[in-house]
């Protein structure tokens, strides 16, 4: 069984490409079924899909994906067809990691070493959600289950034994820093949050600490927006919720807009922002789009009075704190390397299980056949001593037939290898078992 991780992330592809191969949550289960069917349709193929604002990754365990074969191309072709993105456009940004490289990558991702925000913890929760979804879809098996359980254990070990999360500048904190660079004081600004998920909650908490003049939460289901607004109001702020459909009429009221929804299409168009800017009499408006796919049409960035930032734009601010954690990175990498070797040892032992089962099945078939023959001999009155002699002789000949035949018909290096191997296979204790 071969392991494979294929994907793109914030270091290999811009957000304009990442958003085109992102998987909305409701599409992941059917996508897993389609992927497994595409990979030769074998029921033994295991798969999981991780899709976040910074990465889209596919993890597979199958016997048809091996380096140097069409396996990598199969998965690339499926990803290309599923998202209607030309393979030639996607391939230069894709990484394909087999076996130990896939294991190492999974460990690094879960530990926050591969994140834009070095050491961030949100990715671990996202990976756990991806594994849970794959489990519900029935696409996990022995190999990926073991990989991810060890992945979660390694992430816990890394965070517990290193300071990888220290001095971390989160995306939410970076958004606040940007606002402080544009506006003299966040406390005099009106802030709109679009969405009510985990990322928006984190951003709202950071902005709330700056005591803005007003906070409004716009969400498709107003109840969720109201719940977040209530949490923020408890911090002595003026916060309320509106429906997403009210955006067009209310957008001009806000100086800062932070958006992160799961929409597959932009929810703020160029025309809506142009009208808002006009009604604001060209006072500047800052927009932070943390969604992938993007919530704000990219053409909005061309407007003179709009400062539009995406997740990629926030990367420079985030990286300012990364250099301070390089010692922790070295410690984390050492832990991960050790755990990769442990997992690969487990994987290698798993590879012999089918062979052992086949040997056991073959041996049992021989035993049953010779036992039945011995019973027939006893039933017709043959001497028991002769029957036992015949039984033991037949078992010995049949068990040794395979190795003997191989030794007689193998040549060159293969024969030399067998000559070294066979004696060890048939070595037995000098003390008979009783």
UniProtKB/Swiss-Prot annotation:
The lineage of its organism: Bacteria, Pseudomonadati, Pseudomonadota, Betaproteobacteria, Burkholderiales. One of its GO terms (biological process) is protoporphyrinogen IX biosynthetic process from glutamate. This is Glutamyl-tRNA reductase. The keyword Cell membrane does not apply. SUPFAM superfamilies: Glutamyl tRNA-reductase catalytic, N-terminal domain, Glutamyl tRNA-reductase dimerization domain, NAD(P)-binding Rossmann-fold domains. Its EC number is 1.2.1.70. Belongs to the glutamyl-tRNA reductase family. Substrate binds at residues 52-55, 115, 120-122, 126. Possesses an unusual extended V-shaped dimeric structure with each monomer consisting of three distinct domains arranged along a curved 'spinal' alpha-helix. The N-terminal catalytic domain specifically recognizes the glutamate moiety of the substrate. The second domain is the NADPH-binding domain, and the third C-terminal domain is responsible for dimerization. Keywords: NADP, Oxidoreductase, Porphyrin biosynthesis. PANTHER family: GLUTAMYL-TRNA REDUCTASE (PTHR43013:SF1). NADP(+) binds at residues 195-200. InterPro entries: 4pyrrol_synth_GluRdtase, 4pyrrol_synth_GluRdtase_dimer, 4pyrrol_synth_GluRdtase_N, GluRdtase_CS, GluRdtase_dimer_dom_sf, GluRdtase_N_sf, NAD(P)-bd_dom_sf, Shikm_DH/Glu-tRNA_Rdtase. During catalysis, the active site Cys acts as a nucleophile attacking the alpha-carbonyl group of tRNA-bound glutamate with the formation of a thioester intermediate between enzyme and glutamate, and the concomitant release of tRNA(Glu). The thioester intermediate is finally reduced by direct hydride transfer from NADPH, to form the product GSA. It holds the Pfam family GlutR_dimer. NCBIfam families: hemA (TIGR01035). It is an enzyme of class 1 (oxidoreductase). The gene is hemA. Pathway: Porphyrin-containing compound metabolism; protoporphyrin-IX biosynthesis; 5-aminolevulinate from L-glutamyl-tRNA(Glu): step 1/2. The active site is at residue 53. CDD domains: NAD_bind_Glutamyl_tRNA_reduct. Homodimer. The record marks 105 as: Important for activity. It catalyses: (S)-4-amino-5-oxopentanoate + tRNA(Glu) + NADP(+) = L-glutamyl-tRNA(Glu) + NADPH + H(+). It comes from Cupriavidus necator (strain ATCC 17699 / DSM 428 / KCTC 22496 / NCIMB 10442 / H16 / Stanier 337). Catalyzes the NADPH-dependent reduction of glutamyl-tRNA(Glu) to glutamate 1-semialdehyde (GSA). GO terms for molecular function: glutamyl-tRNA reductase activity; NADP binding.
